Amino acid sequence: MEVNILGLIATALFILIPTSFLIILYVKTEAVNDM
C-alpha cells in the first residue's frame, strides 16, 4: 500500500490544529481560574 504523504500531512493538520486550539483555550481558562 502506497503512503500518501499529502494525505498524512492533511490529516495531521486536521487533527493537530483543533486539538492545539482546545489546549490553548483550556490553559487560558485554567490560568484565569487560578487568579
From Swiss-Prot:
Presence of the UniProt keyword Acyltransferase in the record: no
Gene Ontology biological process terms from the UniProt entry: photosynthesis, light reaction
InterPro entries: PSII_PsbM (IPR007826), PSII_PsbM_sf (IPR037269)
Keyword Chloroplast: yes
GO CC annotations on file: chloroplast thylakoid membrane; photosystem II
Sorted UniProt keywords: Chloroplast, Membrane, Photosynthesis, Photosystem II, Plastid, Reaction center, Thylakoid, Transmembrane, Transmembrane helix
Chief place where the protein resides: plastid
Compartment(s) of residence: Plastid, Chloroplast thylakoid membrane
Its biological purpose: One of the components of the core complex of photosystem II (PSII). PSII is a light-driven water:plastoquinone oxidoreductase that uses light energy to abstract electrons from H(2)O, generating O(2) and a proton gradient subsequently used for ATP formation. It consists of a core antenna complex that captures photons, and an electron transfer chain that converts photonic excitation into a charge separation. This subunit is found at the monomer-monomer interface.
Recorded family membership: Belongs to the PsbM family.
Name this polypeptide is given: Photosystem II reaction center protein M
Biological classification of the source: Eukaryota, Viridiplantae, Chlorophyta, Ulvophyceae, Oltmannsiellopsidales
